[in-house]
Curated annotation (Swiss-Prot):
Keyword check for Oxidoreductase: yes
Listed GO MF terms: oxidoreductase activity, acting on the CH-OH group of donors, NAD or NADP as acceptor
PANTHER family, alphabetized: 3-OXOACYL-[ACYL-CARRIER-PROTEIN] REDUCTASE, CHLOROPLASTIC, SHORT-CHAIN DEHYDROGENASES/REDUCTASES FAMILY MEMBER
Biological process according to GO: fatty acid elongation
Record InterPro entries: NAD(P)-bd_dom_sf, SDR_fam
Pfam family, one: adh_short_C2
Binding site for NADP(+): 8-32
Similarity comment text for this entry: Belongs to the short-chain dehydrogenases/reductases (SDR) family.
Binding of substrate, residues: S143
Organism encoding this protein: Mycobacterium tuberculosis (strain ATCC 25618 / H37Rv)
Active-site residues per Swiss-Prot or TrEMBL entry: Y153
Protein name as catalogued: Uncharacterized oxidoreductase Rv0769
NCBIfam families hit by this protein: PRK07231.1, PRK07774.1
Length: 248
């Protein structure tokens, strides 16, 4: 599906990002496994290569313009260009996050610089290289928290949705599409570490399909949105959530 294509996946050292990176490699893409956790990214890239795929790892702080540019330069140097970007990097605080009125502002600013601003920073770093290749596609990681929760994790994802829609308007003329996936509760190490078990149980009870999702449940949507099958889709947010959010 993605032979001769190059994809950058941020936050790819574990969990959802790892699943995206491995799936893209299985479909023939050359993958840049990018993460602030350099050792984790290296391990994922090594496994992709062991499985017969093509990958390199790059350390990146998505909130830092110079770091994002270095990531892109490394990708272009290794593979000659960039076709796809998956903005998956995030700080995840689970449901124990403070409300806006009580969160320490220093932490709030750091949190937003990664979960919200990082989407824009990486998109700005990559889009000209996509345009040089005649276009490309970007998938942003949102969350159903944008509609459900009153803390700043949800607020960051509201912002990601807004960025997705505005950037679709700005990038469309360059034949670059951008969409977002909004997962419901996903069973990852991050979720298990920071979300109280009772809250997880309560969330599952609100999901018509009666279970948490897995990273693999999101892979199909990501691959579709990057592929030519989605060539007339941009600026959209797609819930992949077991029915957690059902809207008319």
């Amino acid at each position: 599906m993605f032979d001769s294509k190059v994809a950058i996946v941020t936050g790819a050292a574990q969990g959802i990002g790892q699943a995206y990176a491995q799936a893209l490699a299985r479909e023939g893409a050359s993958v840049v496994v990018a993460d602030i956790n350099a050792d984790g990214a290296a391990a994922v890239a090594k496994q992709i290569v062991a499985d017969g795929g093509t990958a390199i790892h790059v350390p990146v702080d998505v909130s830092d313009e110079d770091s994002a540019k270095a990531m892109v330069d490394r990708a272009v140097g290794a593979f000659g260009g960039i076709d796809y970007l998956v903005n998956n990097a995030a700080i995840y605080g689970g449901m124990k996050l403070d409300l806006l009125l009580t969160v320490p502002l220093d932490y709030y600013k750091k949190f937003m610089s990664v979960n919200h601003d990082g989407v824009l920073v990486c998109t700005r770093a990559v889009y000209k290289h996509m345009a040089k290749r005649g276009g490309g596609a970007i998938v942003n990681q949102s969350s159903t928290a944008a509609w459900l929760y009153s803390n700043f994790y949800g607020l960051a994802k509201v912002g990601v949705n807004g960025l997705t829609q505005q950037l679709a308007r700005e990038l469309g003329g360059m034949k670059i599409r951008i969409n977002a996936i909004a997962p419901g509760p996903i069973d990852t190490e991050a979720t298990r570490t920071v979300t109280p078990a009772e809250l997880v149980k309560n969330m599952v009870q609100t999901i018509p399909l009666s279970r948490m999702g897995t990273p693999e449940d999101l892979v199909g949507m990501c691959l579709f949105l990057l592929s030519d099958s989605a060539s007339w889709i941009t600026g959209q947010i797609f819930n992949v959530d077991g029915g957690q959010i059902i809207r008319s």
